Design a protein with these regions (language model features):
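Small-residue (G/A/S/T)-rich helix-start motifs and N-terminal tracts that mark the onset
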Residues: 1-135, 144-161, 166-205
Length: 205
């Protein structure tokens, strides 16, 4: 059963719970953000700030350790998880166990922003889909990593939200952007039905 929904500003406000005065950061969820590569530091910073701004109580940012200095100088509120960098300047596959362990201790995981498309990141994407049980958001390069084998989504071990723009969606379903924009709802409904994932197709509509 495919369900569609529309949310406006007032709808979202009504969904936000009031926070108790005796609460702490642990009361409002733990988000694990796995982002960045040698030439893509900004997306990790923006994603982390976005998670904090949206209300996540504790945000842990996992990133290739080559980015340690620029990230440390840009963020103050996150818990840092620097990981071994591959020769490509991205996440090394040696980090898989650490990433899966951190995911198991989180309430939600975001993976993909600026991670690059390499054999290592493709393998990590597959591992998070098939071996992780925490709700998972796949964005940007995570989607580019699976566009050659989208069927991996059918092997998922967790709830998944994908957030493609039209270009990324075109690579996932092998259709041109124009045809997607002409039939956005039909395209997304069909994709959700086939792969049983929640899909947010970004755009002005």
């Amino acid at each position: 059963l495919i369900k569609t929904a529309s949310l406006g500003t007032e709808d979202v406000k009504a969904l936000l719970p009031k926070r108790a005065e005796d609460s702490n950061k642990g009361s409002f969820g733990k988000a694990l953000i796995i982002c960045g590569s040698k030439n893509m530091c900004g997306c990790a910073v923006l994603a982390s700030k976005g998670a904090l701004r949206s209300g996540a109580g504790l945000v842990k940012l996992a990133f290739p350790d080559v980015l340690y200095t620029p990230i440390l100088s840009s963020l103050q509120e996150c818990v840092f998880m620097p990981l071994e960098t591959s020769e490509n300047g991205a996440f090394d596959l040696k980090n898989e166990a650490k990433i899966l362990d951190a995911a198991s201790k989180s309430d939600v995981v975001l993976f993909g922003c600026g991670v690059g498309v390499f054999p290592e990141t493709k393998a990590l994407t597959n591992a998070l889909i098939t071996k992780n049980s925490t709700p998972l958001i796949l964005d940007a390069d995570a989607l580019n990593c699976i566009c050659g084998d989208v069927s991996v989504l059918k092997k998922r071990n967790c709830e998944i939200l994908i957030t493609p723009h039209a270009g990324e969606m075109s690579r996932l379903i092998n259709k041109n952007v124009a045809s997607i924009e002409k039939a956005r709802e039909t395209v997304i409904t069909g994709f959700c039905r086939e792969y049983n994932v929640t899909t947010l197709l970004k755009g002005h509509r």
